[in-house]
Each structure stands twice: as structure tokens, then as C-alpha cells.
Amino acid sequence: MKWKEQAIILGTRQYGETSVILEVMTRQHGRYMGVVKGGRSRRMAVLLQPGNFVEAEWWARLDEHLGLFRLEALDLHAARLILFPEALYALQLIVFHLHLLPERDPHPILYDILHLFMQSFDEPFINAELLVRFEMRFLEELGFGLDLSRCAATGRLEKLCYVSPKSGRAVCEEAGHPWREKLLNLPQFLVQRTVRPVDFSDIKNGFILTGFFLMRHVWEPRNIKQPSVRISLIQLFEQRFRMQASFVDLKTINRM
């Protein structure tokens, strides 16, 4: 058995005295593992850092075998990732989520979002939005997707402002207003792809929304808690948004 595909490195663990077991995410083959001979050498250590983009060739005698990897560097993101704490935390969170999916099960859209994330990891505002979208898609891949297409109560397509915590379906402003304290807020960037998050409240509402359904459908059934890295990441995003807002205010004052 053999395949060759571009991949994003997720992590490694020691295998014998000189080798490692490498874990990557690919578009067509999903999360995959294999042995890299000599992977503990200094030269290979640079290549095998999480976040690096490689051309991966995997082969084994039988499909069920662990197999071997041969790698070629395409884009070594890891050296720059350390400059952006939000990106490091976000990658750790994405890897945490991916570990909840079956190995060798393709999830091309999740791969595409991860790839886009790695292309823009130095843009924290873009990454915050991408991570919310990743968690939304992750829920869908597990069969717990939210229905944000129309109001669950009226069928309306406009002014969708809430999500029912019971059904996971959108609710319009008119129908949801009397029950707004019991509903989850729906940020507009999840409804309209042309809309970008206005401020941190949009991002925070996005994480609250995905976190609620992740807890119900994914974490609690597996007896696991919300990952601490997710909590830290949301706090980092909030700090970054506040710094940006202060910078914008200062520029406005200087023009007066």
C-alpha cells in the first residue's frame, strides 16, 4: 500500500532509539500515523515540528500496518509560530479536536480550514474566526451540526439572531426576543459569509455557541473537560482585540 499527498504535521512521539512515530493531517486520507526512520536526529527535528507543511509519502506492506513516512519540506511554519502565542494555542486546540476523530478517516473541509489557518496564523483576528468555523464544522462532521439556515419557529431567513440550545436551530429576532435570556446568541459572521466579526463580542459569542454543543455532544459523553488551552486561547484573543481597539482609538485621537 502506498500514497503520496501534502500534509500538515500534528506531532511526533519517540519510537525506538532513533526513530519517531509521526502524525499528520491530510486532505484525502485524514489523520495518519507512520514511522520516520532517523526522526530523532537534529536535522529531522526541524522538519517534524507541528504546523509544518510537507509532501508526505506513506507506504506499508498491508494497509493495516503502521507504515513508514518519507517527507519533503514545503513550508516550515513552526519556526515562526513561536512568535504568535494565539497561533500556538489554536494549533494545540485543533490537534485536540482532531484526536477525537477516527484515524485515517478523511475530513477534507477540516483539513482545508487548518490549511487556511496555517497560511494566516500571523493574523489573530482571522484566526479567531477560522477557529470558530473549525469547531462548527467539527460538530457537523461528528453528526451534531447546527441548522442556521432559517428560523426554527417562523421559517424566516432574515434577522437570525439566536440559536435554540435544545434543537441547535436558528431563531429570528422577532420570535426569539421574548426568550432571549434562554437562547444562545448567533454572531452574524456565521450566518453571512460576507460579514466579518465586528468586535470581540462576536468572537466570544461564537466560542460560547460552539462550546455549548461541544460540551453536550462531544466532551461530556467522553467524560472529558473543556481543554484548558481553549480557555487560555479565548483570553488571548480578547486581549489582542482590546489592544487593537485601543490602538484604533489612539489613532483617532491623534487625528483630532
From Swiss-Prot:
Single Gene Ontology BP annotation: DNA recombination
Q: Name one GO cellular component term.
A: bacterial nucleoid
Keyword field: DNA damage, DNA recombination, DNA repair
Does the keyword DNA damage belong to this entry?
yes
Q: Which InterPro entries match?
A: ARFGAP/RecO, DNA_rep/recomb_RecO_N, NA-bd_OB-fold, RecO, RecO_C
This protein's source sits in the domain of life called Bacteria
Gene3D superfamilies cross-referenced by the UniProt entry: Nucleic acid-binding proteins, Recombination protein O, C-terminal domain
Q: Which family does it belong to?
A: Belongs to the RecO family.
HAMAP family documented for this protein: RecO
Q: What does this protein do?
A: Involved in DNA repair and RecF pathway recombination.
Protein's recorded name = DNA repair protein RecO
